[in-house]
Amino acid sequence: MVAAVRYRALFGIPLLLAVAAVLWSFLASSGPIQWMDNGTFIADASEGRYFSDTLGPLDHPLYLFVTTALFAHFGPLVLSFMNSMLLIPLGWAIFRLAKGIGATSQQALLAIAAAVLCHCVFWVSTKAEVYLLHTLLVTLAYMVHFRDKSRLGLLTALFVIGILTGLAAAIHQLTFIVLFPLYVQLVWQHRARVLLTIPGFVLGFAVAIPGVLQEMQNGLSLIDIGHRYLIGIPDNPTEQSWQGSLFRFDDMWHEKNSVGLLMLSLLGPQLVALVLFPRSRRLRLLWCAAVLNFIFAVSYNVTDRFTFFLPGAVLLSIIGVIHVQAWLARRKAAVVAYALPFSGPVTILAVYAVYASGAVSLPTHKEALPFRDDIHYFMAPYLRDRSAETFVHSYEQSAPQGALIVADWTPNGALRSAQASGLLKGRTIALCEGAQDIESYLNGPGAFLARTSYCSSISDRFDLQTLAVGYELRAK
């Protein structure tokens, strides 16, 4: 009897916490209509185009292939839950990786819950976004490195690590930063045998090869293609480039709000892991990868820089839980470890509750969106946000079939994903910079502008009639 109770305490409770964390993500999902990139990913998947015909800095060939297949077979609703579903294999990879570096089963299960409930991981899990699949592949690569060597030989392991690296690289360039410490150790330990990762990489990266071939037909060399994929072409004014945003430590104070959003992912055992240099060599490897990821993400000059921190947050969750749980166990307070995964969410939700009561004000995006509370949307992903869906339903009422709806990038994602879900039938959706023949709509079904932000080229040309949401365009 005593043994059974002890087993439930050591294994059952942490397992329940991990399962509850994953289920919470399903409940908090933003659904098949989403803002900005997230909605655009759903819309792109609906087009039935499995392979990217370019390989630029914003292309994610493997993610496009997977989401297109998922949309074709199961539709937009299941696709909107894809990242929540990916938490299940990610949890398994975290458990195996944690065990591989010496964690107990209890610590490994607590690490799953801590990682899933970490702000950046949970936020991405509720959206259509590339970073969770990427994080799964990176975590699997480290898991294979710390494998049970009696079950998987060295040469096979190197080949598998190469495949996982290629798959991850076919999603995002962050792969080369997060896996850099792993490859340094592989070269140090195995010398020339590391070359076995190359055929694996080529195999994993195969889904991006159609884009490479198309770029070569357009006149780019392999060196130019690689440079463009990694950081863009900064000399090309029409090309979106990473180069001007990388390692912008000089601009962090000016962008302190987005830096603060990233710091929310350190509320809990992750902060302990970041500031304490591990004694264990195995933990040091994960720590180095997480620190490199943190340095990149915190200095990457974009609003949603926190989404680039998922691999580091997962690795820090494992290290932090091991550190803190062991420290608590030595002080006969091991039961407190069960609260570790919830330290971040509880803190965030408490601050949000104070904000929602009106007691304090928090900085919001200077360009507000209809129906969206930015503090709720960005800071509190644990509470479901369906503002994009509400926004779209308003246009179902105000914009008749045949109308033109012009919007900047953020609401455009919501409008396009709505069409992928069967809403806004017969309406034409256009970006502000790409809208054409607007005048032809004025005397017919009408032309509508979602908001004036980032659309001065449109708002300056027409009279704007204010509606409940957005504007109707009229000739001057």
Predicted segments, located by residue:
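Hydrophobic, aromatic-rich transmembrane alpha-helices
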Residues: 3, 258-281
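Extracytoplasmic catalytic/substrate-binding loops of multi-pass membrane glycan-assembly enzymes
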Residues: 28-43, 53-67, 77, 384-387
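Short acidic/glycine- and proline-prone juxtamembrane loop motifs at membrane-interface regions
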Residues: 36, 123-131
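Loop-to-helix entry region of an early transmembrane alpha helix in multi-pass inner-membrane enzymes
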Residues: 57, 61, 65, 73-92, ...
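Perimembrane helix-loop-helix junctions
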Residues: 147-151, 176-203, 277, 425
